[in-house]
Amino acid sequence: MRKDRQNKITEVGIYLKDLQNRLCRAFEKEEGESRFQETLWEKPNGGGGRTRLLTEGHVIEQGGVNFSCVYGNQLPPAATQKHPEISGFDFQAEGLSLVIHPRNPYVPTVHANFRFFIAGKDEADPRWWFGGGYDLTPYYGFEEDCRHWHRVAKKACDRFGEAIYPRFKAACDDYFYLKHRNEPRGIGGLFFDDLNEWEFKRCFEFIKILGDSFLEAYLPIMQNRKNHPYGERQREFQLYRRGRYVEFNLLYDRGTRFGLEFGGRTESILMSLPPRVVWRPNWEPEPGSEEARLYEDYLVRRNWVSVSGA
């Protein structure tokens, strides 16, 4: 039983580290000269990881692609909130987290996460599950970008049944929502947790197909918008909207809570936060402006893959 558990951890880890390498290479190609700087970290008797951070790039103002593999004798509260019956189990967890904060306000911020947990007591049959997804946070909306993003996500999901995309799309809309602002963080994507409804091999295959689809979903958007002209107004709005990103990650994000409760490397956990941000109390967009359109047409629940988008 223990060998089977370790085999699962090893298999998932090999894929996630390879995905980390591919993602970093792809973004470095977009940058030209800037490179991710790698930091290896260890937690005594608790695992470790490799953090890769790119800062002050031409295209990417700050971006992180992190891999971690941690273990312990008790799951942090953030991981057992929905399953208190496993709160006393020892565990192993692996994950890849990506957040890219582009410099150009017309390029959306993007987030992706793929994770695997396995927990058990003694040699009992371990419980395992996958979680993750990806979501997009534009500052200025383009219909074609949103449709492309969601159509790639749907294509990846449809290999596992037509009900998967609507289910995980709805879960993403629900999760990435700022209740105190009464608004979504962005235009969504896919989100899932506790995925173990299929056998391990099929669940893992889903993770791999989703992970492999990420660059197809995001890179064309970055490539099409990274040279879009912008001025001080657009930059200020980007910094203002980044405040919502900070609020969500510090108030609601379960991955952030898990990492901090576990006692992981703080710098790696908080790499999701943008390098520059502003808050403007009581600010409202000018009616009819591009900024107003973001709220009216994009920060709403929509069926992005339909012809009408209604």
Swiss-Prot record:
Enzyme class: oxidoreductase
UniProt KW keywords: Cytoplasm, Heme biosynthesis, Metal-binding, Oxidoreductase, Porphyrin biosynthesis
Pathway: Porphyrin-containing compound metabolism; protoporphyrin-IX biosynthesis; protoporphyrinogen-IX from coproporphyrinogen-III (O2 route): step 1/1
One GO location term (cellular component): cytoplasm
Organism domain of life: Bacteria
BP GO annotations: protoporphyrinogen IX biosynthetic process
GO molecular function, one term: coproporphyrinogen oxidase activity
EC number: 1.3.3.3
Residues annotated as catalytic: 111
Catalyzed chemical reaction(s): coproporphyrinogen III + O2 + 2 H(+) = protoporphyrinogen IX + 2 CO2 + 2 H2O
Entry's localization field: Cytoplasm
Binding site for substrate: 97, 113-115, 263-265
Cofactor(s) the protein needs: a divalent metal cation
Subunit structure: Homodimer.
Described function: Involved in the heme biosynthesis. Catalyzes the aerobic oxidative decarboxylation of propionate groups of rings A and B of coproporphyrinogen-III to yield the vinyl groups in protoporphyrinogen-IX.
Protein family (similarity comment): Belongs to the aerobic coproporphyrinogen-III oxidase family.
Protein name, UniProt field: Oxygen-dependent coproporphyrinogen-III oxidase
Organism: Coxiella burnetii (strain Dugway 5J108-111)
Name of the gene this protein is made from: hemF
